[in-house]
Amino acid sequence: DEECWSLYDVRYVVTQREHASRVYHSILRRSKAAADVVRRGFLTCLPEKETRLYALIKKLYDEGGDFLRNTADPVYYPVAKALRHMSGELEKLRGFVRFSDYSGVLGAEIEPKNRVLPLLRRHFCDRYANESFFIYDRTHKELLVYTKNHSRLLTVDSLHLALPGEEEVQFRRLWKRFYETIAIKERYNPRCQNTFMPKRYRCTMTEFLPDDYEARQQGVNLPAASEASPVPGAPAGISAPATPPRSGPSAPGSDL
């Protein structure tokens, strides 16, 4: 290990789970809302959150939990603001997580500012109860794994995704074609798009990634998939990627 230089003494505090459990339950007895604020507050990206949460807990012991009703309270306000930010990120990630098929296992990556995987865990485990999947948090090096009604959160330094199969690449192209053609050109509004789909989420979204981005990360060249071939099992009404859609009959009563 490299030697670290500091003007201050460094003190390592070993976690005492029994002691921590007693403190948490004492907070819970005073205010269930405060216990939830503390638990979720540790998952936020609030700078110096430990110090701010300590001040909040101290005020809870000294004055009770009534101050939590006032979001303008100088002790509670920064924590409440961080919790709102995390809630907004959670709401977006419930819709922005993009899974790919890796040999029968669904996999996705995210880059959140807050440590959201513990809070997303139940949502995705319920939603994909019959699947096996994983979600990797690049920011916090955390991996959520689910299979056969069991889920685990693991600490993983890095994750190298397997190369996608031809069918997966074709489905990605279909999804991109849908994304590109569903928009109304005359109503294109990048400012509105950036509001509802912020750019920082797009680095892990299929719509904005090359089909073979895993291979590019590993320096592997994949053979080009045939753009004219349809995806196995895809509805006949969906054109193959890069194939212009054919004209169809007009709506009943139309002269077009």
Q: Predicted segment positions?
A:
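Extended, well-folded catalytic/binding cores that form a central cleft or groove in large enzyme
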Residues: 1-249, 253-256
